[in-house]
Swiss-Prot record:
Descriptive protein name: Glutamate--cysteine ligase
Family from the record: Belongs to the glutamate--cysteine ligase type 1 family. Type 1 subfamily.
Keyword hit for Acetylation: no
Keywords annotated in UniProt: ATP-binding, Glutathione biosynthesis, Ligase, Nucleotide-binding
GO cellular component: cytosol
InterPro entries per record: Gln_synth/guanido_kin_cat_dom, Glu_cys_ligase, Glut_cys_ligase
Associated pathway: Sulfur metabolism; glutathione biosynthesis; glutathione from L-cysteine and L-glutamate: step 1/2
Residues annotated as transmembrane: none
GO biological-process terms attached to the record: glutathione biosynthetic process
Gene Ontology MF terms: ATP binding; glutamate-cysteine ligase activity; metal ion binding
Length: 528
């Protein structure tokens, strides 16, 4: 245990500061495809009963018109966020007409690419820019990849907590800069150790044969409609899931916020020949926002992002530059097909202990060799993480995944105990103990459980996904919202539709000029 980690633990364990751990926030975003009762992609428009995908703050769409995204408010206790996520699911299930919410990260059977509907947000300039951006994603990466669903975990520690640590360490940075650099340090540690999350929580070892559509692969055949890898944990996070050759060389540095932002800012200004050959319009219609390596910063696929709540029309890099890092967004978590919400409370409690460990522990700066090592460890774990005796690389030396994982859990125990002391219970320690059992017995991991379920039944990914989707729908529909809860979501939906209509009615100016202005708003020099 590093001296820095020990000092910070002692500081936060002090009675004068312990309550600061209560003041951070957690939020969850869960993506899920709408499917019909046979488990095929639902091709109809976003249900009106769910409100406007553009302006409803809790129910929107991601890439496709068929890919719902449920968003909780940021709460001090993740248990509260999960309760809110549960209410969103119950409302949505009650409004879906002969449709289900897909239970897996990897997609159901998809139609031909041309028939996968791109999300539509209306005719306002903001709505159209979101739609055109998604048209660009289709051209660049294909629609099937964009139908993969994940779960995003938003995490922050309070500004007062960062201020107390800063003062104890006599940092000369201002509060905003210290907080931002501390979150960047958290991200470096997360990237060192995120392979552990893939082993413990990866839940996509198999996929539909239709997903690859003729692409070369190294997967094995389980049945006519199912491909898999026997030791895989998360094919979603492998090169078979989110992957793109154009982004292969883009690896923003995480040694400080400014270098990270400069890297992304260059990428959204850097022309890319293959995209230039496509152009931005076809038959007079916009087909992508620009021909640069990234249309916008969020096009960069990352397992974790530094974030700041943005104002309407503001670019992410502008918000980070102006106001610093506010929270981080963990993006590598698979949907847990055995959990109706896609994530459980014990998993969330472990994530809190893991992320607090990443925030408090020493986080050395990284170089190219470190980045290659952590990228390879992650890639190896998602494809063969349960292989007995699997070796990873730690500072140039081989180490067994199981041994390293158990060592990490011993270190994370300290943050789990700190969080439990603050709550006066043992939920974090219990969650950590459950993860230790998975390291001792790979058969307890979600990925192993998925394969065991497939092997024990009809060996069909699609049928397994459909069974789980039906079971989850029954679970939610058996517990309808009360009148007050239902009124809240009904009002949210109606208000969001009115807001979108007002935006469309009152907007002015030309969309072409709007896009041009948006593209030019990435600063040449940041934070000067």
């Amino acid at each position: 245990m590093s001296n820095l980690f020990t000092r910070r633990l002692a500081l936060l364990a002090d009675d004068a500061h312990r309550d600061l751990l209560n003041q951070g926030r957690r939020g969850i975003e869960r993506e899920t495809l709408r499917v019909d009762l046979q488990g095929k992609l639902a091709l109809g428009p976003h249900p009106v009963a769910l409100g406007s995908a553009l302006t409803n703050p809790q129910i929107t769409t991601d890439y496709s018109e068929s890919l719902l995204e449920f968003i909780t408010p940021a709460e001090h206790d993740v248990a509260t966020a999960l309760e809110e996520l549960d209410r969103i699911h119950r409302f949505a299930n009650a409004k879906l007409d002969h449709e289900l919410l897909w239970s897996q990260s990897m997609p159901c059977t998809l139609p031909e690419e041309a028939d996968i509907p791109i999300a539509w947000y209306g005719t306002s300039h903001i709505g159209m820019i979101k739609h055109v951006y998604r048209r660009g994603l289709a051209l660049r990466y294909g629609k099937a990849m964009q139908c993969i669903a994940g779960l995003h975990y938003n995490y922050s520690l309070s500004e007062d907590l960062w201020r107390v640590i800063k003062q104890s360490e006599q940092s000369r940075l201002d509060d905003k800069s210290y907080q931002s650099e501390s979150y960047i340090s958290l991200i470096r540690n997360f990237q060192r150790y995120s392979w552990l999350l893939m082993y413990l929580f990866g839940a996509s070892p198999a996929l539909s044969t239709h997903f690859l559509r003729g692409r070369e692969h190294e997967l094995q055949t389980l049945s006519d409609d199912t491909l898999y890898l026997p030791y895989a944990t998360s094919l979603r996070m492998s090169d078979l899931g989110y992957q793109n050759n154009a982004q292969a060389g883009l690896m923003p540095p995480y040694n400080d916020l400014e270098s990270y932002m400069r890297s992304l800012s260059r990428a959204v200004r850097q022309a890319y020949p293959a995209y230039e050959a496509i152009g931005t319009r076809r038959n007079g219609e916009w087909i992508q926002l620009n021909t640069n390596l990234l249309q916008i910063e969020n096009e960069y696929y990352a397992t974790i992002r530094p974030k700041r709540v943005i104002n309407s029309g503001e670019r992410p890099v502008e918000a980070l530059c102006a106001r610093g890092v506010q929270y981080i967004e963990v993006r590598c978590m698979d949907i847990d097909p055995f959990e109706p919400l896609g994530i459980s409370l014990p998993t969330s409690r472990f994530l809190d202990a893991f992320l607090l460990f990443c925030a408090l522990d020493d986080s050395p700066l990284t170089d190219e060799a470190n980045n290659r090592e952590r990228t390879e460890n992650f890639a190896r774990t998602v494809k063969e993480g349960r292989r007995p005796g699997l070796l990873l690389q730690r500072d140039g030396a081989a180490v067994k995944l199981q041994d390293w994982g158990l060592e990490l859990l011993e270190r994370i125990q300290a943050t789990a105990d700190l969080l439990d002391a603050q709550r006066a219970d043992s939920q974090h320690a219990q969650a950590l103990a459950a993860q230790k059992e998975k390291l001792l017995d790979a058969g307890l991991t979600p990925s192993a459980r998925v394969l065991a379920e497939l092997q024990a039944t009809d060996k069909s990914f699609e049928q397994f996904g459909l069974r789980q989707s039906i079971a989850h729908a029954e679970y939610f529909r058996a517990r309808p919202l009360n009148a007050e809860e239902n009124f809240y979501f009904e009002t949210l939906a109606k208000t969001s539709i009115a807001e979108q209509e007002e935006m469309e009615r009152t907007q002015s100016g030309d969309f072409d000029a709007f896009v041009e202005a948006y593209n030019q708003r990435t600063p040449q020099q940041l934070c000067d």
